[in-house]
Amino acid sequence: MSFSAETKDELARIEEGKRCCNLAELAALVRMDGTLQIANHSYALNVITESAPVARKVYRLAKNLLGLPVDIMVRRKLRLKKNNSYMVKIYPRTLEDLQQLGLLDEEGEILPGIPNVLVKKKCDRIAYLRGAFLAGGSINNPEGTYHLEIITNDSLHAEALSKLLNKFHLGAKVSMRKSWHVVYIKESEHIVEFLGFIGAHRALLEFENVRVLKDMRNQVNRLVNCETANLNKTVDAAVRQVENIQRVANTIGLQALPEPLREIAELRLEYPDASLKELGEMLVPKVGKSGVNHRMRKIDELAEKLEEQSKRVRKGG
């Protein structure tokens, strides 16, 4: 089972709470996954899902909350690796039943977006978002890129969902994917907050564990890369120093150098892999890293002058 499916399975098993919250959650499930049929002054709501726990939740809420007749049917997929789909058929008795779910107004017209009456309180807003995620949401495995989304075919509903999420400061945005409107969250901290308040505590812990391990791996990689870069710089500098010392030795001889420069030059030739600090500790008296670096720069400057003189002589010859 994918991380997304496990998260939904956990959410679908949360026990029902207050009536207002249950109504908000059912309203989101019906609006996201349902279709309304009206014929001969009778109504039917068909809610289709591939998740058995979600289907059972819709069934329980519709039956226990509104006391409506409900049927549930399983459509078995014949193709391999295809999930079964479940259709929960709800039979609203009156227009008022549909109005309670925020689907129709008093005139029997379809209500756009999310009716305020459903999400007045914080607990209602949380319940509605949980229902919306159960119906049309998904979350990436935290081992990969961080991404949580809820998709809907209604632009007004997408904008309303985004605003509802951003009441909790979750940085939700809306984009288009073919004919679908995608409400998404990218920041890992915001995804963690969302999982927490909708009640996916087991998923939250797994997400956080993976995130911490990823951060540790990234930090170790950065340190290794930094140390490798520093080591490469040290090696390159040592190679350059040896080449310059040899140039001086072949041109004027190391004996022509002042004693402090000659001492460090001889040590560098003898210990080409040593760091500046290690070279300084070999001197008597000891010299700090900056002092050794200063002497090496003097030798580098002298080697460059000798190279320039050699070039001029070759040109003149």
From Swiss-Prot:
Residues 275-308 bind DNA. One of its GO terms (molecular function) is DNA binding. Pfam families: HTH_WhiA, LAGLIDADG_WhiA, WhiA_N. One of its GO terms (biological process) is regulation of sporulation. InterPro entries: Homing_endonucl (IPR027434), Sporu_reg_WhiA_N_dom (IPR018478), Sporulation_regulator_WhiA (IPR003802), Sporulation_regulator_WhiA_C (IPR023054), WhiA_LAGLIDADG_dom (IPR039518). Transmembrane segments: none annotated. Keywords: Cell cycle, Cell division, DNA-binding. Involved in cell division and chromosome segregation. Belongs to the WhiA family. PANTHER family: CELL DIVISION PROTEIN WHIA-RELATED. This is Probable cell division protein WhiA. It comes from Desulfitobacterium hafniense (strain Y51).
